[in-house]
Amino acid sequence: MWDQRLVRLALLQHLRAFYGIKVKGVRGQCDRRRHETAATEIGGKIFGVPFNALPHSAVPEYGHIPSFLVDACTSLEDHIHTEGLFRKSGSVIRLKALKNKVDHGEGCLSSAPPCDIAGLLKQFFRELPEPILPADLHEALLKAQQLGTEEKNKATLLLSCLLADHTVHVLRYFFNFLRNVSLRSSENKMDSSNLAVIFAPNLLQTSEGHEKMSSNTEKKLRLQAAVVQTLIDYASDIGRVPDFILEKIPAMLGIDGLCATPSLEGFEEGEYETPGEYKRKRRQSVGDFVSGALNKFKPNRTPSITPQEERIAQLSESPVILTPNAKRTLPVDSSHGFSSKKRKSIKHNFNFELLPSNLFNSSSTPVSVHIDTSSEGSSQSSLSPVLIGGNHLITAGVPRRSKRIAGKKVCRVESGKAGCFSPKISHKEKVRRSLRLKFNLGKNGREVNGCSGVNRYESVGWRLANQQSLKNRIESVKTGLLFSPDVDEKLPKKGSEKISKSEETLLTPERLVGTNYRMSWTGPNNSSFQEVDANEASSMVENLEVENSLEPDIMVEKSPATSCELTPSNLNNKHNSNITSSPLSGDENNMTKETLVKVQKAFSESGSNLHALMNQRQSSVTNVGKVKLTEPSYLEDSPEENLFETNDLTIVESKEKYEHHTGKGEKCFSERDFSPLQTQTFNRETTIKCYSTQMKMEHEKDIHSNMPKDYLSKQEFSSDEEIKKQQSPKDKLNNKLKENENMMEGNLPKCAAHSKDEARSSFSQQSTCVVTNLSKPRPMRIAKQQSLETCEKTVSESSQMTEHRKVSDHIQWFNKLSLNEPNRIKVKSPLKFQRTPVRQSVRRINSLLEYSRQPTGHKLASLGDTASPLVKSVSCDGALSSCIESASKDSSVSCIKSGPKEQKSMSCEESNIGAISKSSMELPSKSFLKMRKHPDSVNASLRSTTVYKQKILSDGQVKVPLDDLTNHDIVKPVVNNNMGISSGINNRVLRRPSERGRAWYKGSPKHPIGKTQLLPTSKPVDL
């Protein structure tokens, strides 16, 4: 009487509600259609052929059954009393011969022994292409066996009703035969449990002995046997739908049982005006149609309860699925977010998951069902103005949504039930929209927008040509500030040009460094970002280049105005509070403070090239070497502190302007808008410079750190004046570079390369005076300076590392740092793996043994010698030359320490370079012989210098955020540990290995390795 799909849905709902059994992907009637094509291709074979391809015989009361099955069961009925029937196996040779005869169509079963026929019957089921009990139902059938006895039988029989009709006929016939066999169990010893154990692997086609027998396998086999036993015991009820399921269907459909139409097609026929809609509706499953009414029959559940699946239906916002007649009441564009493929997939889920919705919950009589569903469906899928104000992107789609809302309001008022649903919607503030609605690139969205789309696309082309104007706009859109609750009232008042999500994906340029993200949806939003966002895309865009050219002067003028008023502690607090309040909400404050400390730390570590760029006024800026070479006990009130203050104050000033002065004209707007942008741009540029100058800086540090302090104090004033003269043109040049970078993003690599060369050329002069301020300690300023430095370092580290919240931003930023940067490729040569010469390996083994013999003071001292890069020797001569170079460096240090009087007239740089060249010329004759004769005295003289180096360099390592250390010359303490201490001894071993030198190499017959002391396990040997 009822359509088979309706019956199946009612069965699935009942199984899920009463027994907790979910059935996924039941194919049902599709099996017959799938095998019909295969049936024509196969000839007269019997084994390994699907049921549809077999010859059938009509059996009264059972329908059409495969002829082989009928013949086999009829033959075995004559031998039903045979003991161990189906248990005893027949002869394998006879079975093969019998199978061949049957495949060739010979009727030989009547004369065959019963055990052979029984074995052939088992083989027939085992060789079916698909098990007669479909694999889709196996899990549900096994789950049903774990219920109580009565519930187990009912659930198993209900699951059998989900099978296709021809499968039901075959199962009913065969299990009825097996039941007759079990009724004669007193004679044949084969009751239903024994038969179930035998036939379960054949009917369910489990693996035959391939698995190891485990406890899980045994349990599974027992459950499978229980399934077959239940079907044997209740064979006559297989596939018979109970009456209480059939009685539910009229109530499910909301119609009278007496006037019920016999098919689903007749029920749906009059509902659609156009044939296209009717055809689409006929393709749709009745799952969404039926599921709501089935809630009435669930135990202990009232219709007012909204189940989880109903929420899913609401969130997906698809009126086509929510109600059968939503198409009639909603405007045409209501389903604009979904393609037909998406709709089909959702319908498929609704079909088999049977998601219960509240379509019929509010109806008291069956007649009012259609009115309720139309009104409720439209009200659920529509969004009230309160919702729009709270949660959705303000893009070009806003006018479209407002049109839809207006249309739906009219529909709801006409239905007469609008008042019932408005409080329900207003409580749901978080309606999650689907991705296709959010990023709608489809045809429907364009059609609804109408003529406004043309202007929008023209502006898209203009913006693509001038991408610079979109820097802050896309930044603020991406941060999520537009998601805040009160954006809608502000942005339309400002008359901003609206950008849809699809255009935004087209227009997104490379990310800026310091992009802020809004972490929470509930916290207070930043009004200043909204103001800038509203203004920027309109009239202010044309003034961009002028504002860019004006910006450096504005920044420099603002910074000294308030620098004297703020102590470092106030500065840090103010900076923290400003940055914390702008991008993050209240519950993220604890995270933000740690983040900002990291940001400031990375600022100080990335070097004063950043500061030289930012402050034109600070002509006496000292470079990175100052932070790195000076220890805390020697810090003083230097220009560096002013530098830190002005750097912070620029940001603080811009943020104050950003928040408080919103309407003071174009100059005010340029200050608010572009100073954070430039700060972020400097951050990126100085990171590149820091990479390029890292090797040069470390080399300079090695030279300067060994100078005596009294000599440096005498050179202090002259070198300071010299640097001030040389610094100012570089500052002007860097400011010009800064403006160029803001106006033209494409020139970034060029500017970075230019600034790198400048930094290299001027670094030798800058670093000469870096150590000059060591001799004037002032303890009162030390604490302030130290705390300021730590805050600066920690805060700036995280501004580059932790503010990128998206994976794509991480990848883009990382590629910008490591892969796509030509400057980094120039600095670092690729790794070359070569065969190590024998002598060099001997020298390394000797140096490691020598290292293990040193006292702890030597080991600590040698750890400081890590700044020089690892020298890769190509041959024996190359290794020798590298040793000579390292020895020359140390001998020059000793020369400087012994005789500073001779070098007083020189400047710092000239003295060091001259000393190195002179000592390298004299090395083979003097210092090398001295080292050969007196290695201990040389080591003793070098010990203090290496300790001093180690102290300084522990603070002086240049760390860059997001650094990729894969192809760097990685600084390793163990590799260079004997450069300063035992270089003379190594040279001696290389040139002329003596008897004592040969004795160092353990493992010879004279010196077996057992006598030596092994290296400590705590220190890994890195060769």
Swiss-Prot record:
SUPFAM superfamilies: GTPase activation domain, GAP (SSF48350). Coiled coil: none annotated. The modification Phosphoserine is found at S285, S316, S318, S339, S340, S484, S582, S585, S638, S675, S847, S868. Residues 721-734 have a biased composition (Basic and acidic residues). Keywords: GTPase activation, Nucleus, Phosphoprotein. InterPro entries: ARHGAP11A/B, Rho_GTPase_activation_prot, RhoGAP_dom. GO terms for molecular function: GTPase activator activity. The record marks R87 as: Arginine finger. One of its GO terms (biological process) is signal transduction. Changing E605K: In a breast cancer sample; somatic mutation. Its main location: nucleus. The modification Phosphothreonine is found at T306, T323, T508, T866. Residues 567-589, 714-734, 999-1023 are annotated as: Disordered. GO terms for cellular component: cytosol; nucleus. It is found in: Nucleus. Pfam families: RhoGAP. Residues 49-239 form the Rho-GAP domain. GTPase activator for the Rho-type GTPases by converting them to an inactive GDP-bound state. This is Rho GTPase-activating protein 11A. It comes from Homo sapiens (Human). The gene is ARHGAP11A.
